[in-house]
């Protein structure tokens, strides 16, 4: 059995949905289909999820958003008309959407989640209707009826363990299962969404619950590339990588696959195949527990911007019990999460995403560190990019760090910080945002130029 997930770009038009139909029906093993909301039909288009967010926010502010709501309905209507479906499905989507928008707004976060989730929910209903119209037995399955229960954390739901046993019962159903991605239900019966792009997570949860043999994730690229294609022309494709490698790359800016989505599949030992809806015959990228490390130490290079660092210096810091814990506790008390903590004997650097810390919070954090920890020096540096060099084979290859540092030096990129995880799956380099592209290109040239990568 295979669980198949299609992203928004694969479902943005009737023509795309017809491709999905042929992909699903070409393989009898594909029994469960997880769908996103319609994405962009063309470059200047707006994703349905973004329309719904704007619609919900305007309803919360003014109690009305007729133009935005009709724009959402129109996206579904265009798809339905392309597929020659009747108007009844569109009228149902319109009625359900307006009922939802005019519903209870006493909890704005939960209201926003319910409206956002309707993008996937209505698309699943439309897709199930299309499959039936084409003569295929297909059933829309509501996550609540299937028993997909999650924590009550709007916008950041975590699956509850009992869900997997509930979902296993879906194996008993005949025909195709069409399942909306991105959300589950709290035990109180409220719609709660995963983090953005959370349909990947739903697919992985469903694959785990159904004990699938394979989780296929269809998107709009032929494979996972070894580097961002906007930085390097015609980068190498990766045919196989491990869960840990994919997690590191997804975290650091690879947008092909949601980093949280690997966890349910990983725990069940289910391989993940990333494929292209527009070129389904391409082999794609397979994510597995273990792979042969025969093609060099590095499998991919990823980068992301929008970071800042808090540098803390104090003489004899290493002799002070609990210093690091107390520093991180100050961040916790300000509602801040951190990414990395490289350290020395008399200093430590806390790296975090700068978007979560405004000027007032920054001043408060600095003051607390100076007063509570009696730090000799506290310096905050903004506009940093983190570059991750990833590969399971790095632990078995001497000199990988030296090669990376030398490549950056020769490209005249100043390394602001460097950190290597204890697992040795990745190395992190911090550079100025303005030097991100140059740094990534230099590292790609060092590790991939002229080398066959798989």
From Swiss-Prot:
The keyword Ribonucleoprotein does not apply. One of its GO terms (molecular function) is ATP binding. This is Aspartokinase 3. Residues 312-388, 389-454 form the ACT domain. InterPro entries: AceGlu_kinase-like_sf, ACT-like_dom_sf, ACT_Aspartokinase, ACT_dom, AKIII_YclM_N, Asp/Glu/Uridylate_kinase, Asp_kin_monofn, Asp_kinase. It comes from Bacillus subtilis (strain 168). It comes from the Bacteria. Catalyzes the phosphorylation of the beta-carboxyl group of aspartic acid with ATP to yield 4-phospho-L-aspartate, which is involved in the branched biosynthetic pathway leading to the biosynthesis of amino acids threonine, isoleucine and methionine. GO terms for biological process: diaminopimelate biosynthetic process; homoserine biosynthetic process; lysine biosynthetic process via diaminopimelate; threonine biosynthetic process.
